[in-house]
Amino acid sequence: MSEHIVFLTGKLAERNLRREIEALGPEAFTHDVVRLPISVAGLMTADFIGRHFSPDGTGARIDRVIVPGRCRGDLGALGLALGLAIERGPDELRDLPVHFGRKRKGADLSAQDVLIFAEIVDAPMLSVQDIVLRAQAYRRDGADVIDLGCLPETAFGHLAEAVQALRALDLRVSVDSLEPADLRTAGRAGADYVLSLKPDAIGLADEIGSTPVLIPSEPSDTDSLYRAIGQMQRRGRPFLADPILEPIQFGFTRSLARYQDLRERHPEVPILMGTGNVTELTDADTSGTSAVLLGVAVELRLNAILTTAVSPHCRRCVREADWARRMMHAARESQSLPRDFTDALLTVHARRPFPYSSDEISQIAAEVRDPNFRIQVGAAGIHVFNRDGLSVATDPYQLFSRLDVEQDGAHAFYLGIELARAQIAWQLGKRYSQDEELDWGVAYERPAEDKLTHRAPGPTLVARRRRARRT
């Protein structure tokens, strides 16, 4: 027996909801669409549903009830009261196929097998307290190991203290220096890893308990790296090997090939790739760059990456690497392309930016019977409508004369913010939802919302209500 689902909706969304359900195909499930006495479905709450929805009214067995994604309130308590399984659907009706698993892979993104080393490149210039604060921020972003970068000809007198402070917080620590004295200090202070040992410094590994990262004498001298690998294997000591990723136009492609060659020749050797030479030295948004580099790392089954966040455009590199390693791991394990797992790395453009065509928005607008402005974005531009009509423009200034809000400062302020968001969404090809911030993926951490509580009225709505009481 197929599952029977009841969809709750409002007046304006009913037609589009029915169309989307039918597009899923008759074999998916049986269903009823119940329109509650509300125009905008997204404004219904759990309390409202409890007052206006009766399961007996459908006259059929109900396996679950799906309410609009923006519905607020305690659906668990509502489900207990009604004796039904109740869940939120997607925010946009066009995403129903995704909700029902038609396109999303539904993989477990908690799985990954690439360690992230996050380097604090100016550690000698920071106090121990500031190093700890930076390290904690990197850990929140997904770093597994905090790398303390040493600077040439710069004293790091508090290196041991910094290592011990991080270890006391249960953080794994690496120290990055070409000076043997720094690496000895790091090892004796309890550092988990030391970067980087060239072949002529292999003997240092015998003096400390830290796991070394091996690099070639010169990036192009892979034979020296293989000799170092052999020496460490004969010692029976753990290590990582790094053939060194070079900047684009300065040996990048050849250096990628060295990682592939190392993996093929030594499938048993743990490998680290430093990504900063590409992310830091390329003027391109790092979400895409990080995705490609982690794609290479996961495909070659590399074991770790070292990333930096020095340049302002690299400020999210640690978080991007964390999302990228999880997405790429899920794609590899499911033997599929890295698509439809997460939108976290789609920071500038959306895969499906405009859920409705201009004709569909016009049909929605024709159903509106109140003066409140609705805003939607389609391929043709910004669509603004209420009971008095629909206007479409690509520049918010073109809409000003049609809005008639010169005497209502609070409402004009609100519409200005929403139209600015809508214009950005149209220009970049992003998803726009009225009263919601634009989704910038991993580039900006949006405050978490508690859908069990009702959203407090915004200051512009409070001002309009206050003004209405005075008139």
Question: Where are each of the predicted segments found?
Answer:
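Long, compositionally biased, glycine/small-hydrophobic-enriched stretches that function as flexible linkers
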Residues: 2-109, 342-471
